[in-house]
Amino acid sequence: MKRLWLLCPIAILLLSAAAQEADPAGFEHWTPASLKNFESKMHADASTDPHHFAVKLLADFPNDSAMLVHRESDGQAEWHETQVDVFFVQSGSATLLIGGTLVNGETVGPHEKRNGTIQGGVRRKLSAGDVVRIPPRVPHQLLLEGASEFNYFVIKVKGY
């Protein structure tokens, strides 16, 4: 009888472990704590970067990618022919200059231009908790305008 009582807890543990399924391929889960763990390293990386910018690629899949970005100064003007950007603001504040025309942008990769300036466009103030979606072929640039830093989670949806 004593052996049976010893075997019952072991059997329960084995059955519950077998009942749990593995996460599906491609599933990712980032908690606020796991994202916060990257902040100090990204802050250090940004302090040595000429653009005062650091990025941590979290996942790269055929149709999308996810990254964490830390900025301590204005970003470059950007334009993506086929990608959608979705920003989830974690902390800090910035102004998003969006729309208008990218002038003198340089091709930096397939379907992507950076640098240059944006003529026209509208400004949207961003702060923690905000989410924005930037469609393909829309120039955009983050401006800190006096803020010391800006942290955001980015999903890039690839359209090619």
Predicted regions located by residue number:
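Short, conserved beta-strand element in jelly-roll/cupin
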Residues: 81-96, 100, 110-114
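Conserved metal-binding segment of the jelly-roll/cupin
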Residues: 125-145
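A short hydrophobic beta-strand segment most commonly corresponding to one strand
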Residues: 147-160
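An anionic, turn-rich surface loop/hairpin at beta-sheet edges
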Residues: 105-127
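A short, N-terminal "cap"/entry segment at the start of jelly-roll beta-barrel domains
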Residues: 18-81
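His/acidic/aromatic-lined binding-pocket segments of jelly-roll/cupin-type domains
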Residues: 78, 85-88, 123-124, 131-132
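Bacterial N-terminal signal peptides
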Residues: 5-16
